[in-house]
Design a protein with these regions (language model features):
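C-terminal structured domains
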Residues: 143, 156-271
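Short coil/turn linker and secondary-structure boundary residues
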Residues: 5-9, 75, 211
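A general marker of short, structured functional hotspots
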Residues: 13, 80, 84, 105, ...
Length: 271
């Protein structure tokens, strides 16, 4: 790192991990990463009714926020917001503002799942956060990628982002290095398109909700995946392998509870 002229606080985190000082590493991680930049004023783009004092704070009793999400159902097929609703319904996810929902900030990354064309398995989560981290030119954003690797490869973090629980070994799966590299390539091109990088977790996606997915991809410089990444198993949210068995079952149960026919919109669990 010294030879490459790299010197930032996240190096201290890496050193702590390398020496087995996981508790100290976690403290450094929280102080040096993306979450340290959080300010309650950032709540505005999330449309939560009250200020959120922690980046990953949940909002489980906010009728106005829940209604804003529910209104996305009225958008036409192909609109970004409508496709996000499909993403939620297929997996049994609940909207922010309702019980058992993801933190509003974490829900921001669900728009990127749809926009960038990634499914919702753990492997796809690694791809999404690689894309988001590289699209942002602020080095603090790298901590988002470090977080998901610590959750879903090393297990150094037991939990993260107010919802995720650790599940080791997913980056080691065959083809994941190619898929992660391609996600970072696409994120870099997105950053270049913006001229100075873009923080996709701080975008007001509701302002874009009625626009088509294709239009938004063009505006933000989201290029197609490489053929090699697809060959290595990179999936969209709408095909076989793009949803986990647990999510598929949750989607069915949620549809039954709501009295509607379940539709996974083409998604199937991997074989």
């Amino acid at each position: 790192a010294r030879d490459l002229g790299v010197d930032n606080d996240m190096l201290r985190v890496a050193h702590r991990y390398a020496h087995g000082s996981l508790g100290l590493a976690l403290i450094d991680f929280q102080r040096s990463g993306y979450m340290e930049l959080w300010d309650p004023s950032h709540t505005t783009v999330l449309h939560a009714s009250g200020a959120l004092h922690d980046a990953w704070e949940q909002s489980v009793s906010d009728p106005a926020l829940a209604a804003r999400w529910e209104a996305l159902r009225d958008l036409p097929d192909g609109a970004l917001g409508r496709e996000v609703v499909k993403f939620y319904d297929a997996r049994g996810f609940t909207f922010p503002g309702t019980p058992k929902s993801a933190p509003p900030l974490l829900a921001q990354h669900d728009w990127v799942h749809v926009l960038a064309g990634y499914g919702s398995t753990v492997e796809s989560e690694l791809e999404v956060f690689a894309f988001i981290s590289r699209a942002n030119d602020d080095p603090h954003a790298f901590s988002l990628l470090a977080m998901v690797i610590s959750l879903f490869e090393t297990g150094y973090l037991a939990s993260g982002a107010g919802l995720f629980e650790y599940d080791r070994g997913h980056l080691s799966h065959e083809g994941m290095a190619v898929r992660m590299a391609d996600a970072m390539r696409r994120g870099a091109l997105c950053a270049a398109s913006a001229g100075h990088g873009t923080d996709l977790l701080q975008r007001d996606w509701f302002a874009d909700a009625a626009r088509s997915v294709d239009e938004m991809r063009g505006e933000l410089g989201v290029v197609p995946k490489s053929d090699r990444a697809i060959e290595m198993g990179s999936m969209t949210a709408w095909e076989k392998g793009g949803i986990s068995p647990f999510q598929y079952n949750c989607g069915r149960q949620a549809a039954d509870a709501a009295g509607r026919v379940y539709d996974a919109y083409g998604a199937e669990p991997p074989s």
